[in-house]
UniProtKB/Swiss-Prot annotation:
Job description of the protein: Forms an efflux pump with AaeA. Could function as a metabolic relief valve, allowing to eliminate certain compounds when they accumulate to high levels in the cell.
Protein topology in the membrane: Multi-pass membrane protein
Protein name per UniProt: p-hydroxybenzoic acid efflux pump subunit AaeB
Major site of localization recorded for this protein: membrane
NCBIfam families attached to this UniProt entry: PRK10631.1
Natural source organism: Salmonella arizonae (strain ATCC BAA-731 / CDC346-86 / RSK2980)
One Gene Ontology CC term in the entry: plasma membrane
Keywords, comma-separated and alphabetical: Cell inner membrane, Cell membrane, Membrane, Transmembrane, Transmembrane helix, Transport
GO BP term (any one): carboxylic acid transport
Domain of life: Bacteria
Ranges that cross the membrane: 13-33, 38-58, 69-89, 93-113, 121-141, 152-172, 370-390, 407-427, 431-451, 459-479, 482-502
Length: 655
């Protein structure tokens, strides 16, 4: 298949995008909106954005959710713009600079919140800047301008959602059902590898793959939740299944680690059971039945705790999986599982990275302002808007440099494409709404094909082309204005790219160290006698951090193993029967305070001092456990944790 060929699976979304653009264009001109371009641009971005991210037609609900975020971001941006203008209308330069800081602040927030919700904050940052720049000549029209922008954006979003519904969006439910079955088989095969205690690299690859697949399943759950309210019960079950999948990974890896020192704990009976190969979820079901019978026969005390916990988690997984597939009413047994433990959210480890993004966005916007004022260029405001858009959207993604390059390619491609529409197509079709709609439908269709292939520059070309062609009411054709707009877009992208190159993001190592210390803090915080604290479910948050660590440091197995060991320590200590008394409770609080000091330390010297203090306190704690006659289920995990912290002290304290 050629580079520019059209695959059958790409056609439906391309038609959907073309329909969204045509609907927005028709409604914009029919209701005599002053700037129908905003409605068309919004419809195109809202529809094409999820397709570019997914690399194909987005699942049902994705476009609707993105549209809602865009509405929220636009309203926040408009309110911020009104407040800034009312407060500083007598100082125009200060007003623009405050808007630059606001754009940076929104980028900072978007770097800390969930990636799905960050779009709203990024959008609110540059919306305020667009409004402030546009009303420079007529500041008294600010409320009217903000209202018009909100109205046209809502119309564009409505058109994108309507087009999505007209062309029967794909449901992700079948994918979820298939993945649940496949994931359970993979979990069983991981436990087989761990029982065999074979090659450590093979085990690392297996559990790493399962962590990624579990994270992907959680993303599917979010999509299913956005799709329809009828999946509420399935959504509740999938939340619990996420924890169960992570529990299965943890128990399997702990089984592998236990055999490093005490291989005799895994009896021949269980070794023989796990030698049976499995291919389907039915095979796993049969094996679990056999294991439950063996556990009843041998007794819980004779069964290794990791295997006992694994079989229990796998059984609960099977029960909830059947409920997800059938979407039936939640039974009493399921409700008991679902009401289990409150999930704890962890503090972001990317605060330094977020601050770098703040400075990148703020400085690039300020640089654009200075460039505009110094040159007096009529399209300097267009360049500033493009700077704000690029930096606000690029900063929240893993590779902002490539996002900038995508925008540069897109704006360069938009120049000849926009020229064709501006000089030839639109002047010859503006008298006929049908021809005008068809001409833009063709543009949307072919770019829609390329967007699904994630072609470099396709997303930027779509937005930039619509932005520079004349879609105003009434239409006016001034070539100098068109050329200024096109060049302003290119210059804005270039300036944003230069700032991103100059303001280096060196936060990667710091983020990695903070993540590892958060794992240590989680393991230490599990040493508690507080019943409410012991019920807290930190497993999803810990694996979310592990997933971030894997993305930041691909292939760094020592870091992954250390993090996984801390997660295992946390789970084991959380279930350990720690003696309940005031002496240990006071010391638990002291340990948690010291672990928090390690995370928040401002430099390496302080961090080393607090980490050394933590190690000393753990030694004292082990002595206290001996005095209070704690059982081996408590003393052994604490000893292993202390040994790991001594071994990796430098990795956890040095920048």
């Amino acid at each position: 298949m050629g580079v520019f060929s059209i695959a059958n699976q790409h056609i439906r979304f391309a038609v959907k995008l073309a329909c969204a653009i045509v609907l927005a264009l028709f409604i914009g001109f029919h209701f005599q909106l002053e700037t129908p371009r905003w409605a068309v641009l919004t419809a195109a971005i809202v529809a094409a954005g999820p397709a570019f991210a997914a690399g194909g037609e987005p699942y049902s609900g994705a476009i609707r959710y993105r549209g809602m975020l865009r509405i929220i971001g636009t309203f926040i941006g408009c309110i911020a713009a009104l407040i800034i203008i009312i407060s500083m209308i007598r100082a125009p330069l200060l007003m623009i600079l405050v808007c630059c800081v606001w754009a940076g602040f929104c980028t900072w927030i978007s770097s800390l919140v969930r990636i799905e919700n960050s779009y709203a904050w990024g959008l609110s940052g540059y919306t305020a800047l667009i409004i402030v720049i546009t009303i420079q000549t007529e500041p008294l029209l600010t409320p009217q301008f903000a209202l018009e922008r909100c109205s046209e954006i809502v119309i564009g979003i409505g058109c994108a959602i309507l087009a999505d519904l007209l062309f029967s969006p794909r449901s992700i439910k079948q994918e979820v059902d298939r993945e649940l079955d496949s994931l359970l088989v993979a979990q069983y095969q991981l436990m087989q590898l761990c029982i065999k205690h074979g090659d450590s690299e093979e085990v690392d690859n297996a559990w790493g793959d399962l962590v990624r697949r579990t994270a992907a399943l959680e993303g599917m759950r979010s999509n299913l939740n956005m799709e329809s309210s009828r999946w509420v019960r399935a959504n509740r079950r999938l939340k619990a299944l996420n924890t169960l999948s992570l529990t299965l990974i943890t128990q399997s890896c702990e089984t592998y680690l236990i055999q490093n020192t005490r291989p005799e704990l895994i009896t021949d009976t269980f070794r023989e059971l796990f030698e049976t190969p499995v291919e389907t979820v039915q095979d796993v079901h049969r094996q679990l039945k056999r294991m439950r019978r063996v556990i009843v026969w041998t007794g819980e005390r004779e069964t290794p705790v990791t295997l006992y916990s694994w079989v229990g988690a796998a059984t609960r997984y099977l029960l909830l999986k059947r409920g997800v597939i059938s979407n039936t009413k939640i039974s009493a047994t399921e409700e008991e599982i679902l009401q289990g433990e409150p999930v704890v959210k962890v503090e972001s480890a990317e605060r330094h990275h977020a601050m770098v993004n703040f400075w990148r966005t703020t400085l690039s916007c300020v640089l654009g302002t200075l460039f505009w004022l110094w040159t007096g260029w009529t399209s300097g405001n267009g360049a500033m808007v493009m700077i704000a858009v690029v930096t606000s959207l690029a900063m929240r993604l893993p590779n902002p440099r490539m996002v900038c390059i995508d925008f540069i390619y897109g704006t360069l491609a938009a120049l000849p494409l926009g020229l064709l529409y501006f000089l030839v197509i639109i002047p010859n079709t503006q008298q006929s709404m049908l021809l005008l709609c068809l001409s833009l439908a063709v543009l949307g269709f072919f770019i829609g094909i390329e967007v699904q292939k994630r072609r470099l520059g396709s997303m930027g070309a779509l937005a930039s082309t619509i932005n520079i062609i004349v879609l105003d009411n009434p239409m006016t054709f001034h070539f100098s204005q068109f050329l200024d707009s096109a060049l302003g877009q290119i210059v804005g992208c270039m300036l944003a790219f230069i700032v991103i190159l100059l303001v280096r993001d060196k936060s990667k190592d710091r983020t990695g160290r903070v993540l590892l210390n958060q794992f240590v803090s989680a393991a230490v915080s599990a040493m508690t006698t507080n019943a409410a604290r012991r019920k807290e479910n930190r497993l999803p948050a810990l694996y979310q951090q592990l997933f971030l660590l894997m993305n930041k440091f691909p292939g760094d197995l020592p870091k992954f193993r250390l993090a996984l060991t801390m997660i295992i320590a946390h789970q084991r200590l959380r279930d350990a029967p720690i003696p309940v008394n005031e002496d240990l409770s006071v010391f638990h609080r002291q340990l948690r305070r010291t672990a928090d000091h390690v995370i928040s330390a401002g430099n390496d010297d302080k961090r080393r001092r607090y980490f050394g203090q933590l190690l000393d306190e753990l030694d004292i704690y082990q002595e206290k456990l001996r005095i209070w006659e704690a059982p081996p289920q408590v003393t052994e995990p604490v000893k292993r944790l202390t040994g790991m912290l001594h071994k990796y002290q430098n990795a956890l304290t040095d920048s």
